Amino acid sequence: MWQLLLPTALLLLVSAGMRTEDLPKAVVFLEPQWYRVLEKDSVTLKCQGAYSPEDNSTQWFHNESLISSQASSYFIDAATVDDSGEYRCQTNLSTLSDPVQLEVHIGWLLLQAPRWVFKEEDPIHLRCHSWKNTALHKVTYLQNGKGRKYFHHNSDFYIPKATLKDSGSYFCRGLFGSKNVSSETVNITITQGLAVSTISSFFPPGYQVSFCLVMVLLFAVDTGLYFSVKTNIRSSTRDWKDHKFKWRKDPQDK
Protein backbone atom coordinates (compact mmCIF):
# COMPACT_ATOMS: atom_id res chain seq x y z
CA MET A 1 0.00 0.00 0.00
CA TRP A 2 2.86 2.41 0.86
CA GLN A 3 4.40 1.89 -2.59
CA LEU A 4 1.13 2.95 -4.18
CA LEU A 5 0.39 5.91 -1.94
CA LEU A 6 3.63 7.85 -2.44
CA PRO A 7 3.65 7.97 -6.28
CA THR A 8 -0.13 8.43 -6.34
CA ALA A 9 0.03 11.35 -3.91
CA LEU A 10 2.72 13.03 -5.98
CA LEU A 11 0.85 12.55 -9.24
CA LEU A 12 -2.34 13.93 -7.67
CA LEU A 13 -0.37 16.92 -6.41
CA VAL A 14 0.95 17.65 -9.88
CA SER A 15 -2.23 16.95 -11.82
CA ALA A 16 -4.70 18.59 -9.44
CA GLY A 17 -4.20 22.16 -10.48
CA MET A 18 -0.44 22.72 -10.07
CA ARG A 19 0.47 25.14 -12.83
CA THR A 20 3.96 25.90 -14.11
CA GLU A 21 4.12 29.11 -12.09
CA ASP A 22 3.25 27.13 -8.95
CA LEU A 23 6.27 24.84 -9.28
CA PRO A 24 9.32 25.55 -7.08
CA LYS A 25 12.42 27.03 -8.69
CA ALA A 26 15.49 24.83 -9.11
CA VAL A 27 18.78 25.99 -7.55
CA VAL A 28 22.35 25.60 -8.84
CA PHE A 29 25.19 25.09 -6.36
CA LEU A 30 28.92 25.28 -7.10
CA GLU A 31 31.29 22.73 -5.63
CA PRO A 32 33.72 23.92 -4.47
CA GLN A 33 31.96 27.20 -3.68
CA TRP A 34 34.27 29.50 -5.70
CA TYR A 35 32.72 31.05 -8.81
CA ARG A 36 36.11 32.47 -9.91
CA VAL A 37 38.51 29.70 -10.91
CA LEU A 38 41.74 29.26 -12.88
CA GLU A 39 42.23 27.32 -16.08
CA LYS A 40 42.61 23.56 -15.51
CA ASP A 41 40.55 23.70 -12.30
CA SER A 42 37.80 21.11 -11.86
CA VAL A 43 34.30 22.39 -11.09
CA THR A 44 31.06 20.61 -10.22
CA LEU A 45 27.67 22.28 -10.62
CA LYS A 46 24.80 20.61 -8.76
CA CYS A 47 21.11 21.08 -9.50
CA GLN A 48 18.73 20.95 -6.55
CA GLY A 49 15.13 20.49 -7.66
CA ALA A 50 12.04 18.31 -7.42
CA TYR A 51 11.66 15.17 -9.51
CA SER A 52 8.74 12.87 -10.25
CA PRO A 53 9.13 9.08 -9.83
CA GLU A 54 8.93 8.64 -13.62
CA ASP A 55 11.54 11.23 -14.64
CA ASN A 56 14.70 12.14 -12.72
CA SER A 57 16.51 13.83 -15.61
CA THR A 58 17.93 17.36 -15.41
CA GLN A 59 18.21 20.00 -18.12
CA TRP A 60 21.38 22.11 -18.04
CA PHE A 61 21.93 25.40 -19.86
CA HIS A 62 25.20 27.25 -20.47
CA ASN A 63 24.68 30.82 -21.71
CA GLU A 64 21.10 29.79 -22.66
CA SER A 65 22.31 26.85 -24.80
CA LEU A 66 21.14 23.36 -23.81
CA ILE A 67 23.88 21.03 -22.55
CA SER A 68 23.67 17.34 -23.42
CA SER A 69 24.18 16.21 -19.80
CA GLN A 70 20.98 15.08 -18.02
CA ALA A 71 22.54 14.17 -14.67
CA SER A 72 21.78 16.18 -11.54
CA SER A 73 25.48 17.19 -11.40
CA TYR A 74 27.46 18.74 -14.26
CA PHE A 75 31.20 18.14 -13.99
CA ILE A 76 33.93 20.24 -15.66
CA ASP A 77 37.19 18.31 -15.45
CA ALA A 78 39.67 20.97 -16.65
CA ALA A 79 38.07 24.39 -17.01
CA THR A 80 38.87 26.67 -19.95
CA VAL A 81 37.90 30.26 -20.66
CA ASP A 82 35.12 28.91 -22.90
CA ASP A 83 33.46 27.42 -19.81
CA SER A 84 32.90 30.91 -18.40
CA GLY A 85 29.35 32.23 -18.33
CA GLU A 86 25.92 31.63 -16.83
CA TYR A 87 24.65 28.19 -15.85
CA ARG A 88 21.04 27.25 -15.15
CA CYS A 89 19.20 24.00 -14.55
CA GLN A 90 15.63 22.71 -14.56
CA THR A 91 13.80 19.51 -13.58
CA ASN A 92 10.37 18.27 -14.58
CA LEU A 93 8.88 19.44 -11.26
CA SER A 94 10.97 22.64 -10.91
CA THR A 95 11.12 25.78 -13.01
CA LEU A 96 14.31 27.19 -14.50
CA SER A 97 16.84 28.22 -11.84
CA ASP A 98 18.38 31.64 -11.43
CA PRO A 99 21.72 31.92 -13.24
CA VAL A 100 24.99 31.08 -11.50
CA GLN A 101 28.07 32.81 -12.89
CA LEU A 102 31.33 30.96 -13.49
CA GLU A 103 34.49 32.93 -14.33
CA VAL A 104 37.56 31.10 -15.63
CA HIS A 105 40.74 33.20 -15.41
CA ILE A 106 44.25 32.80 -16.81
CA GLY A 107 47.11 33.44 -14.39
CA TRP A 108 49.33 32.13 -11.61
CA LEU A 109 47.26 33.35 -8.67
CA LEU A 110 43.60 34.13 -8.08
CA LEU A 111 41.99 35.62 -4.98
CA GLN A 112 38.76 33.72 -4.32
CA ALA A 113 35.74 34.41 -2.11
CA PRO A 114 32.14 33.13 -2.12
CA ARG A 115 30.99 36.69 -2.88
CA TRP A 116 32.30 40.26 -2.68
CA VAL A 117 29.49 42.04 -0.79
CA PHE A 118 28.98 41.26 2.91
CA LYS A 119 26.95 42.63 5.80
CA GLU A 120 28.48 43.72 9.07
CA GLU A 121 29.33 40.72 11.27
CA ASP A 122 29.23 38.31 8.33
CA PRO A 123 32.21 35.93 8.22
CA ILE A 124 34.59 36.44 5.27
CA HIS A 125 36.56 33.57 3.74
CA LEU A 126 39.39 34.43 1.32
CA ARG A 127 41.58 31.98 -0.58
CA CYS A 128 44.81 32.66 -2.47
CA HIS A 129 44.47 29.99 -5.16
CA SER A 130 47.46 28.93 -7.27
CA TRP A 131 47.40 27.46 -10.78
CA LYS A 132 47.12 23.66 -10.62
CA ASN A 133 47.41 24.05 -6.82
CA THR A 134 51.15 24.56 -7.18
CA ALA A 135 52.98 24.90 -3.84
CA LEU A 136 53.06 28.53 -2.73
CA HIS A 137 54.92 30.01 0.25
CA LYS A 138 55.47 33.37 1.94
CA VAL A 139 51.89 34.35 1.15
CA THR A 140 50.56 37.80 2.02
CA TYR A 141 46.95 39.03 1.85
CA LEU A 142 46.84 42.78 1.26
CA GLN A 143 44.06 45.32 1.81
CA ASN A 144 44.34 48.72 0.12
CA GLY A 145 48.01 47.99 -0.63
CA LYS A 146 48.94 47.18 2.98
CA GLY A 147 49.74 43.73 4.33
CA ARG A 148 46.78 42.31 6.23
CA LYS A 149 47.81 38.70 6.91
CA TYR A 150 51.01 36.71 6.32
CA PHE A 151 51.45 32.93 6.08
CA HIS A 152 54.75 31.12 5.64
CA HIS A 153 52.82 28.37 3.81
CA ASN A 154 49.72 29.09 1.77
CA SER A 155 46.56 29.19 3.92
CA ASP A 156 43.07 30.63 3.66
CA PHE A 157 42.38 33.95 5.38
CA TYR A 158 39.32 34.21 7.61
CA ILE A 159 37.70 37.32 9.04
CA PRO A 160 35.23 36.05 11.71
CA LYS A 161 33.03 39.18 11.83
CA ALA A 162 33.20 41.81 9.11
CA THR A 163 33.23 45.51 9.98
CA LEU A 164 33.01 48.57 7.76
CA LYS A 165 36.81 48.88 8.01
CA ASP A 166 37.13 45.60 6.09
CA SER A 167 35.83 47.23 2.90
CA GLY A 168 38.48 47.89 0.28
CA SER A 169 40.62 46.44 -2.49
CA TYR A 170 42.28 43.08 -1.85
CA PHE A 171 44.89 40.92 -3.55
CA CYS A 172 47.36 38.24 -2.52
CA ARG A 173 50.95 37.48 -3.44
CA GLY A 174 53.50 34.75 -2.78
CA LEU A 175 56.49 32.82 -4.08
CA PHE A 176 56.55 30.00 -6.61
CA GLY A 177 60.05 28.81 -5.86
CA SER A 178 61.93 32.10 -6.27
CA LYS A 179 59.28 33.67 -8.54
CA ASN A 180 57.22 36.43 -6.91
CA VAL A 181 53.62 36.42 -8.24
CA SER A 182 50.47 38.39 -7.40
CA SER A 183 46.75 38.01 -8.03
CA GLU A 184 44.47 40.56 -9.60
CA THR A 185 42.85 43.09 -7.26
CA VAL A 186 39.21 42.68 -6.25
CA ASN A 187 36.93 44.96 -4.23
CA ILE A 188 35.17 43.81 -1.07
CA THR A 189 32.21 45.86 0.19
CA ILE A 190 30.78 45.72 3.72
CA THR A 191 27.25 47.10 4.10
CA GLN A 192 25.63 48.32 7.31
CA GLY A 193 23.02 46.24 9.06
CA LEU A 194 23.21 42.89 10.77
CA ALA A 195 22.54 39.70 8.87
CA VAL A 196 19.12 38.33 9.78
CA SER A 197 18.91 34.63 10.62
CA THR A 198 16.08 32.89 8.79
CA ILE A 199 15.08 29.33 7.97
CA SER A 200 17.35 29.60 4.93
CA SER A 201 20.30 29.58 7.34
CA PHE A 202 19.37 26.03 8.21
CA PHE A 203 17.93 24.89 4.89
CA PRO A 204 19.48 25.99 1.55
CA PRO A 205 16.85 27.03 -1.06
CA GLY A 206 16.91 23.68 -2.78
CA TYR A 207 16.38 21.81 0.46
CA GLN A 208 13.47 24.10 1.33
CA VAL A 209 11.84 22.93 -1.91
CA SER A 210 12.41 19.28 -1.04
CA PHE A 211 11.25 19.82 2.56
CA CYS A 212 7.96 21.43 1.47
CA LEU A 213 7.33 18.70 -1.10
CA VAL A 214 7.99 15.98 1.46
CA MET A 215 5.57 17.61 3.91
CA VAL A 216 2.84 17.68 1.24
CA LEU A 217 3.48 14.03 0.39
CA LEU A 218 3.41 13.01 4.06
CA PHE A 219 0.08 14.81 4.48
CA ALA A 220 -1.33 12.98 1.45
CA VAL A 221 -0.07 9.62 2.71
CA ASP A 222 -1.41 10.29 6.21
CA THR A 223 -4.82 11.20 4.78
CA GLY A 224 -4.85 8.03 2.68
CA LEU A 225 -3.97 5.88 5.67
CA TYR A 226 -6.70 7.56 7.76
CA PHE A 227 -9.43 6.75 5.27
CA SER A 228 -8.06 3.24 4.75
CA VAL A 229 -8.07 2.47 8.49
CA LYS A 230 -11.50 4.08 8.90
CA THR A 231 -12.92 1.89 6.11
CA ASN A 232 -11.43 -1.26 7.65
CA ILE A 233 -12.87 -0.41 11.08
CA ARG A 234 -16.34 0.18 9.60
CA SER A 235 -16.12 -3.10 7.72
CA SER A 236 -15.06 -5.01 10.84
CA THR A 237 -17.84 -3.40 12.90
CA ARG A 238 -20.46 -4.28 10.28
CA ASP A 239 -19.26 -7.89 10.13
CA TRP A 240 -19.44 -8.14 13.93
CA LYS A 241 -23.02 -6.80 14.02
CA ASP A 242 -24.17 -9.14 11.25
CA HIS A 243 -22.73 -12.21 12.95
CA LYS A 244 -25.38 -14.34 14.75
CA PHE A 245 -24.38 -16.10 17.95
CA LYS A 246 -26.14 -19.26 19.14
CA TRP A 247 -26.27 -19.85 22.89
CA ARG A 248 -26.92 -23.10 24.68
CA LYS A 249 -27.10 -24.06 28.27
CA ASP A 250 -24.36 -26.10 29.83
CA PRO A 251 -25.66 -29.46 31.10
CA GLN A 252 -24.50 -28.51 34.60
CA ASP A 253 -26.99 -25.61 34.62
CA LYS A 254 -29.99 -27.93 34.51
UniProtKB/Swiss-Prot annotation:
Please name the source species.
Homo sapiens (Human)
Q: What is the effect of changing residue 222 to N?
A: Has little effect on complex formation with CD247 or FCER1G
Q: Which SMART domains match?
A: IG (SM00409)
Which one GO biological process term can you cite for this protein? calcium-mediated signaling
Its biological function? Receptor for the invariable Fc fragment of immunoglobulin gamma (IgG). Optimally activated upon binding of clustered antigen-IgG complexes displayed on cell surfaces, triggers lysis of antibody-coated cells, a process known as antibody-dependent cellular cytotoxicity (ADCC). Does not bind free monomeric IgG, thus avoiding inappropriate effector cell activation in the absence of antigenic trigger. Mediates IgG effector functions on natural killer (NK) cells. (Microbial infection) Involved in Dengue virus pathogenesis via antibody-dependent enhancement (ADE) mechanism. Secondary infection with Dengue virus triggers elevated levels of afucosylated non-neutralizing IgG1s with reactivity to viral envelope/E protein. Viral antigen-IgG1 complexes bind with high affinity to FCGR3A, facilitating virus entry in myeloid cells and subsequent viral replication.
Task: Write down which residues bear the modification named Phosphothreonine.
Answer: 237
Q: Which gene encodes it?
A: FCGR3A
Instruction: State the oligomer form and interacting partners.
Output: Forms a heterooligomeric complex with ITAM-containing signaling subunits, either a homodimer of CD247, a homodimer of FCER1G or a heterodimer of CD247 and FCER1G. Interacts (via transmembrane domain) with signaling subunits; this interaction is a prerequisite for receptor complex expression on the cell surface and intracellular signal transduction. Binds the Fc region of antigen-complexed IgG with a preference for IgG1 and IgG3 isotypes. Interacts with CD2; this interaction is involved in NK cell activation and cytotoxicity.
The name of this protein is Low affinity immunoglobulin gamma Fc region receptor III-A
